Regions:
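Extended hydrophobic leader/signal-anchor segments used for secretion and membrane insertion
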Residues: 1-110
Length: 110
């Protein structure tokens, strides 16, 4: 994974929206490991093709339209949120990190 040169190794992110319910809810704070290898099923912080930062679930590795490596990212709540069903495959360099745990309000590993 690339695209993390200007990021710290670890960081906090705040959840906005309901696209990842019931796993994450609005206002949750999560710990992100930037540059961590992505595996299918992992929660990731990604920059979607429209520039939006979002937490989504990495479903599977897929090629982008240009043939480069990427990920098919989905919302846990299929009724809400925008994901690869709407925006297509997200390039590897746009997958910024892996969400390791929720730190607030109820800490738990993800």
């Amino acid at each position: 994974m690339t695209g993390t040169e200007n990021h710290p190794q670890w960081g906090l992110a705040r959840v906005h929206g309901r696209s990842m319910t019931p796993t994450l809810t609005p206002g949750d704070r999560v710990l992100v490991r930037y540059g961590a290898p992505v595996t299918p099923g992992a929660l990731v912080l990604a920059r979607l093709p429209d520039g939006t930062l979002a937490i989504k679930r990495a479903r599977e590795a897929r090629a982008t339209r240009s043939g480069g490596p990427g990920w098919w990212l989905l919302s846990d709540n299929a009724v809400e949120g925008v994901d690869s069903r709407h925006r297509g495959v997200v390039a590897d360099e746009s997958v910024l990190g892996v969400v390791r745990l929720r730190v607030w309000p109820r800490p738990r590993r993800l």
